[in-house]
Regions:
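Negatively charged, low-complexity tracts enriched in Asp/Glu with abundant Ser/Thr
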Residues: 1-25
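Short aromatic-glycine-(Arg/Gly/Cys) micro-motifs in beta-strand/loop hairpins
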Residues: 27-54, 72
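A short, charged, amphipathic alpha-helix used as a generic interaction element across diverse proteins
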Residues: 60-73
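Intrinsically disordered, low-complexity charged/polar segments
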Residues: 75-80
Length: 80
């Protein structure tokens, strides 16, 4: 999966509550995908917009990071 495919999935499935590499402060209850240098970072935030302890995973491969990001986002949206 690449970024365009991930965005299409998000739109098609009407997924909400995410930050996909946006330069802004975290918001409450969202799944975050950030690129830092050559690494992809995926984590979740809580009701106070703080990073959830032990939720961060680091990937060297964009596809793996996007798969994890979409999986978490789908799970998060099922809980809403």
């Amino acid at each position: 999966m690449n970024i365009k495919e991930a965005i299409k999935m998000i739109q098609d499935e009407k997924l909400q509550g995410y930050n996909m590499n946006e330069e802004r402060y975290n918001r409450e209850n969202e799944v975050v995908l950030m690129r830092e240098n050559d690494k992809w970072i995926v984590y979740a935030t809580d009701e106070r917009a703080s990073k959830v302890t032990n939720s961060q995973d680091i990937y060297l491969d964009e596809e793996e990071a996007l798969d994890d990001f979409i999986d978490r986002l789908r799970a998060f949206n099922r809980l809403r």
